[in-house]
C-alpha cells in the first residue's frame, strides 16, 4: 500500500512496521498478533517500534488514519473547486460514487479495509473515536458536493451533513455485502445507491439512473 509520507529519514522503517502489521492481521492466525511477530516480519528492533509508536493500539490507530487519508485524498479531488471541467454537483456526486466503488472493490485496497475493520483493530483503545473521525474525514468531500447542489438548486431537498452520512452508510453496506464479490453486481450496487441518493436529494426523475439497471 502506498504510505502517507512521514517526511522523516526513518519513514521507511515506520512504513515497514505498518505494512508488516497489515500482513500479520490479514493472514489467518489464532489469537492476537503480538508486537514481536510484527517486529520479526518488519525486521526492525523493539527500539525502532517505540520510536514511532507508543503501543500496539497507537499503531492500529495510525493504520486506520493512513487508510482513511488515502481514500479521502482520492475523493477530495472530485469535490475540489478546481476539478477539471468544473463539473456540476450531480456529475460530482456520480463521480464520487464511481470512485468509492472502484477504490473499495480493488483487490489491494479491499484487503486494507478488511484489516482496519477486523475485531483486533476494533479492540484498540481509542478505536471508536478514531473511526468516527475517519468517517467525518472520508465524508467531507461528499458534504461539500451536496452543499454545492443545495446552493445551485441541483439537490433541493438535501441536508448535506445528514444526507452524506446516510449515503455513505448505504455505500458501506453495499461494499460489505457478499454480492460485491461478484463483479457483475458492483455496477448494480452502485446504481442502487445512486437511485436512493437522488430520491433523497429531490433530483428530478429525468436525472435518475435508467430503470434497466435495477435487474438483479
Where are these regions (language model features)?
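Hydrophobic/aromatic-rich alpha-helical bundle segments in the mid-to-C-terminal region
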Residues: 110-115, 128, 132, 150-196, ...
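Amphipathic alpha-helical packing segments from all-alpha helical-bundle domains
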Residues: 69-72, 76, 125-152, 161-165
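N-terminal intrinsically disordered/low-complexity leader segments
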Residues: 1-12, 207-216
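Hydrophobic alpha-helical connector segments
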Residues: 62, 76-108, 163-167, 190, ...
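A short, Lys/Arg-enriched amphipathic alpha-helix from helix-turn-helix/homeodomain DNA-binding modules
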Residues: 11-23, 74, 123
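Helix-turn-helix
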Residues: 16, 24-58, 62, 66
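Short secondary-structure transition hinges
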Residues: 101-140
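Hydrophobic/aromatic residues within well-ordered alpha-helical segments
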Residues: 13, 56, 63, 67, ...
